[in-house]
């Protein structure tokens, strides 16, 4: 047999290494609708490794942007031209002008090109201390992408035209242990031909019965089933456990939630057992945790609440979206639970207009956690994932954690919250919540584009400030929230007296004269809000006493429900660790520039790259 030439052996080894590298990227996202641009990435110590697989023989652009556009973005452009690789670190200014970075922080590992595709693999440190680079954190990031059929140098900076876009991702979401759906049974909870009204916000509720199991099983994965072309219509889905005293008669109908004619059975469904929001994908439970079904303590009847967002008032929409739950008789060690924490959704939560930033806080108080955990789990519960939830005015959300007056590391955060991308964040390390701890859901809003008050409520034009904590082992605590005192808020704008007893909602103001016979909502809108008044009001509401919500399943309550509490006094705020920057380090790589050159030249003779390019 004729021996292989050394360069052929080398080429085979390199291509094999490239294919193996593709399998080492645990995260994958298709960035465009035509599946022409595929992003793979993975954490490598203090850096992030990327692999781009794009259907073009020209340049490929990739970037990180605060707002999803080209202005003030961190960009890298690369490709293979004439058998030689190129990869350049760029940035854009506020006018979207592309400029080469003096400090090159993206490091090429390898590049390949065939008759249809270009593959680029490169890395970058999370923190470079380059003012032209965007730090990579656990927050949402708007990934921007573009490509062209020509390389960058052929005719200057070729405009990418329509082959561009943006997608929100969480690049540092920890790797999760996937389960093979083929090995699991599943059942679907989906709406059946729901007529979505031609109004901006609809909450539709439908009862379901969990398929009867004769022994305990664990749900290990939940996937959204969103009807095609309804990805922007279905804003979120909540699944509630209902009273075990119901019977099959409740299954015959769906109805608008929170409606005066809503069926009485809906009021028995208070315990959230799963939450999905727009932009999110399926959720896989950790290997040691599952959602229990099949026992007397588990949900038999569930209520699925679907939030439809129809701002264009489109008529004739029919929806069949829902959830798919995968389950197994092979039990995990722990049962999962969900706690809804934050601000109770209410008109008592309000935000003045014209504010560049306004902060609201929802408290899961030490009194509630002391009572509930002290009775059910004195050694604490373990949080493994968090979903942070707000609406259109939301800009950032933090879940703060306090113990004995000392602030702990943030439980979860998103400094670049995207209303259109809300999913459970897997925590890098599980966090223990102990009796007597405090949790604060801190939401940052911007209302610079609004001329009237923004109110807490169900519409996406209203606001929420909530966190959904996935934890184990399951205890009898479903909601841990707060409502700020409304009367002190009204005193800020000069309200002196309201009509009592309260017979209408919103209640009516009696004095002073300028607000007489106005509802408190009308009075707040009538007040002349300035930025300075808004700042003073914000300082006030963060110090107000609050009404505590501390709920069990089946509409039961812990004894502290309805009592008054005060925000915690923080003796020792958490000090973040200093950022260590690196711009010169590169991921360990066995491919030298000389070896890479062989790949660049030889790859042009390869018909395709096998399974790594689709």
UniProtKB/Swiss-Prot annotation:
UniProt-listed PROSITE patterns: DOMON (PS50836)
Binding site for Cu cation A: 235-236, 307
The organism's place on the tree of life at top rank: Eukaryota
Classification via InterPro entries: Cu2_ascorb_mOase-like_C, Cu2_ascorb_mOase_N, Cu2_ascorb_mOase_N_sf, Cu2_monoox_C, DBH-like, DOH_DOMON, DOMON_domain, PHM/PNGase_F_dom_sf
UniProt keyword annotations, A-Z: Copper, Disulfide bond, Endoplasmic reticulum, Glycoprotein, Membrane, Metal-binding, Monooxygenase, Oxidoreductase, Signal, Transmembrane, Transmembrane helix
A GO cellular component entry from the record: endoplasmic reticulum membrane
Residues with attached carbohydrate: 114, 247, 476, 517
Membrane topology, record value: Single-pass type I membrane protein
Localization terms from the record: Endoplasmic reticulum membrane
Keyword Transmembrane found: yes
GO MF annotation list: copper ion binding; dopamine beta-monooxygenase activity
Keyword Ribosomal protein in record: no
Main location: endoplasmic reticulum
Protein name according to UniProt: DBH-like monooxygenase protein 1
Lineage of producing organism: Eukaryota, Metazoa, Chordata, Craniata, Vertebrata
């Amino acid at each position: 047999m004729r021996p292989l030439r050394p360069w052929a052996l080398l080429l085979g080894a390199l291509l094999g290494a490239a294919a193996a590298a593709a399998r080492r990227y645990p995260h994958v996202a298709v960035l465009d609708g035509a599946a022409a641009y595929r992003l793979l990435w993975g954490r490598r110590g203090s850096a992030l490794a990327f692999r781009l697989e794009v259907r073009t023989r020209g340049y490929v652009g990739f970037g990180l942007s605060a707002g999803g556009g080209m202005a003030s973005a961190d960009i890298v452009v690369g490709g293979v031209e004439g058998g030689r690789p190129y990869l350049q670190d760029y940035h854009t200014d506020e006018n979207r002008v592309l400029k080469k970075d003096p400090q090159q922080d993206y490091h090429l590992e390898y590049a390949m090109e065939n008759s249809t595709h270009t593959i680029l693999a490169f890395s970058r440190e999370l923190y470079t201390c380059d003012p032209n680079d965007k730090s990579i954190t656990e927050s949402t990031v708007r990934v921007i992408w573009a490509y062209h059929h020509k390389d960058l140098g052929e005719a200057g900076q070729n405009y990418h035209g329509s082959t561009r876009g943006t997608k929100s991702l969480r690049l540092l979401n920890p790797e999760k242990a996937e389960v093979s759906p083929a090995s699991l049974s599943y059942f679907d909870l989906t709406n059946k031909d729901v007529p979505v009204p031609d109004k901006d916000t609809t909450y539709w509720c439908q009862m379901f019965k969990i398929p009867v199991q004769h022994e305990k099983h664990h749900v290990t994965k939940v996937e959204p089933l969103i009807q095609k072309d309804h990805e922007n219509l279905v804003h979120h889905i909540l699944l509630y456990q209902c009273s075990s005293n119901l019977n099959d008669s409740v299954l015959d109908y769906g109805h608008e939630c929170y409606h005066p004619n809503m069926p009485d059975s809906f009021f028995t469904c208070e315990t959230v057992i799963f939450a999905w929001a727009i932009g999110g994908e399926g959720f896989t439970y950790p290997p040691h945790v599952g959602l229990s079904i099949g026992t007397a303590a588990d949900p038999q009847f569930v209520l699925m609440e679907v939030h439809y967002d129809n701002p264009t008032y489109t008529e004739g929409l029919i929806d069949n979206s829902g959830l798919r739950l995968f389950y197994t008789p092979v039990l995990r060690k722990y049962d999962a639970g969900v706690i809804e924490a934050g601000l109770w959704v209410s008109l008592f939560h309000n935000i003045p207009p014209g504010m560049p930033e306004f902060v609201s806080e929802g408290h899961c108080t030490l009194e509630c956690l002391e009572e509930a955990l002290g009775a059910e789990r004195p050694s604490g519960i373990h949080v493994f994932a968090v979903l942070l939830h707000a609406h259109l005015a939301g800009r950032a959300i933090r879940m703060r954690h306090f113990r004995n007056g000392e602030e702990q590391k943030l439980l979860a955060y998103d400094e670049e919250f995207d209303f259109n991308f809300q999913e459970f964040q897997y925590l890098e390390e599980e966090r223990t919540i102990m009796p007597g701890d405090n949790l604060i859901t801190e939401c940052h809003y911007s209302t610079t584009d609004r001329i009237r008050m923004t109110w807490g409520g169900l519409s996406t034009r209203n606001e929420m400030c909530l966190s959904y904590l996935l934890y184990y082992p399951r205890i009898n605590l479903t909601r841990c929230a707060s409502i700020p005192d409304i009367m002190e808020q009204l005193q800020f704008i000069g309200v002196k007296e309201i009509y009592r007893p309260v017979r209408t909602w919103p209640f009516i103001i009696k004095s002073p004269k300028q607000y007489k016979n106005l509802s408190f909502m009308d009075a707040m809108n009538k007040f002349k809000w300035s930025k300075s008044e808004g700042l003073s009001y914000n300082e006030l509401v963060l110090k107000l006493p609050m009404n505590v919500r501390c709920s069990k399943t089946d509409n039961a309550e812990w004894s502290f429900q309805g009592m008054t509490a005060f925000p915690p006094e923080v003796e020792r705020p958490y000090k973040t660790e200093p950022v260590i920057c690196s711009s010169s380090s590169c991921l360990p790589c066995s491919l030298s520039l000389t070896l890479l050159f062989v790949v660049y030249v030889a790859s042009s003779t390869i018909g395709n790259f096998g399974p790594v390019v689709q």
